[in-house]
Amino acid sequence: MNCFSYFFLVIILCAGLNNAKFNEKNSVIFKSSLGPKKLLRIHCTSEHDDTDYVYLRHGQTYAFSFHDSVLKTIFDCELKQGSSYYNYNFYARFRAYKGGGLIVHYGKKNFWDAREDGIYFTHGKETPKLEYKWIPGDPSMRVESPL
């Protein structure tokens, strides 16, 4: 190969890497498909992050993005549904994202859809499937007996 061939190869490789999804953030996306008078409360945490409380009405979405850690990346979330900010009738706790370790993901998307019968999941390429059922009650209102 002559110098021009090497130069051309480097240009092609640089252009290809520039267009790749390398270093694109991963995302967790939530949608409320609950009834029009229902409120969805979302709270997600990881070892280093806390999303605070997010409230969605019917049809609204919420997303957060991040890079995978080389060690591991885990986001656990609690969703509650109810008729107001202080009245929740059902909840669900689950792992909304797991990644990192030996395989670092780039541009991975986890879509969660809160519906009346439960929480549905997809990566966006397939039809969402029911992953979690709602649990009756509000865990923050439970009182443990001292006995």
Curated annotation (Swiss-Prot):
Regions annotated as coiled coil: none
Subcellular localization, as worded in the UniProt entry: Secreted
Annotated signal peptide: 1-20
Domain of life: Eukaryota
Keywords associated with the record: Secreted, Self-incompatibility, Signal
GO cellular component, as recorded: extracellular region
Family: Belongs to the plant self-incompatibility (S1) protein family.
Primary location class: secreted
Keyword Phosphoprotein applies: no
InterPro entries according to UniProt: Self-incomp_S1
Pfam families registered for this protein in UniProt: Self-incomp_S1
GO biological process: rejection of self pollen
Protein name: S-protein homolog 10
